[in-house]
């Protein structure tokens, strides 16, 4: 695993970099970058950490490609800065609304390896530094951990 290595990339629904299977069962931090038609540069959309980033990205790709965007959500999606991100979701179905929304809004997407360990602090630092638009620090804005 290499830092800043592209794990998967597509432009206009055409695969540019095939999914790198060596990331299956690999621990680490990934970032999803996207670009809208009218934009020239990619922006950071999401950052995630996992003990198996390859399998997590495969699940995310499934939602991007095979789950249709729905407009029947009831909870406004807000990021870690309490900014409304343009869509609403149904309880317990955040990912099934988020990824189809991203697929609808962005013409170019790439998953990138950021770090080779699942480290929450590094995930936070990267997400804040890159201003990951949809990132939520693990929970909706203003929601505390329950013990």
Regions found by a protein language model. Give the residues of each.
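Boundary/linker segments flanking structured domains
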Residues: 1-147
């Amino acid at each position: 695993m290499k830092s800043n290595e592209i794990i998967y990339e597509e432009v206009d629904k055409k695969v540019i970099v095939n999914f790198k299977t060596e990331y299956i069962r690999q621990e680490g931090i990934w970032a999803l970058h996207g670009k809208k038609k009218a934009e020239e540069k990619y922006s950071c959309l999401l950052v995630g950490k996992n003990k198996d980033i390859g399998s997590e990205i495969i699940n995310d790709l499934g939602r991007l490609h095979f789950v249709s965007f729905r407009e029947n959500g009831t909870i406004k999606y807000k990021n870690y800065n309490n900014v409304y991100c343009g869509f609403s979701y149904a309880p317990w179905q955040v990912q099934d609304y988020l990824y189809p929304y991203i697929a609808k809004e962005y013409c170019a997407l790439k998953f990138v390896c950021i770090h080779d360990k699942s480290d929450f602090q590094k995930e936070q630092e990267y997400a804040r530094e890159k201003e990951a638009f949809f990132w939520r620090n693990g929970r909706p804005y203003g929601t505390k951990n329950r013990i």
